[in-house]
């Protein structure tokens, strides 16, 4: 896959996608009513901000592919939901899982 400074191999892209999937999964654990108690010491807002900055860096490196726009939109919607007084974990979860599914579209040439 072409990027700003050259080319990433298919295995590099696959490895990165796997790591990004794992980072997105943590977003679920941090807010899941069944597991959130285990992560009280985690600064969720900071984790989220750092993750978004990392995705923004990828966005620039890959010359702004469409799936990353969608990923960022879904994640921002999840974050907004997480900050509401009437936080609905299922709504939040749906946004995160939608973003999770879009990760696999990064690098697909036929994505428009």
Residue ranges of predicted features:
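Short intrinsically disordered terminal tails
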Residues: 1, 48, 109-112
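Short terminal alpha-helical segments
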Residues: 1-42, 96-105
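Generic preference for well-ordered secondary structure
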Residues: 4, 8, 55, 59-62, ...
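Amphipathic alpha-helical interaction modules
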Residues: 22-73
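Amphipathic alpha-helical binding modules
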Residues: 72-112
């Amino acid at each position: 896959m072409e990027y700003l400074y050259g080319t990433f191999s298919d295995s590099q892209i696959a490895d990165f996608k796997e790591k990004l999937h794992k980072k997105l999964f943590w977003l679920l654990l941090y807010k899941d009513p069944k597991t959130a108690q285990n992560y009280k010491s985690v600064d969720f807002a900071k984790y989220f901000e750092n993750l978004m900055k990392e995705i923004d860096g990828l966005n620039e490196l890959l010359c702004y592919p469409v799936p990353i726009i969608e990923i960022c939109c879904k994640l921002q919607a999840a974050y907004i939901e997480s900050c509401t007084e009437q936080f609905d974990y299922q709504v939040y979860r749906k946004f995160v899982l939608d973003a999770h599914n879009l990760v696999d579209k990064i690098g697909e040439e036929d994505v428009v």
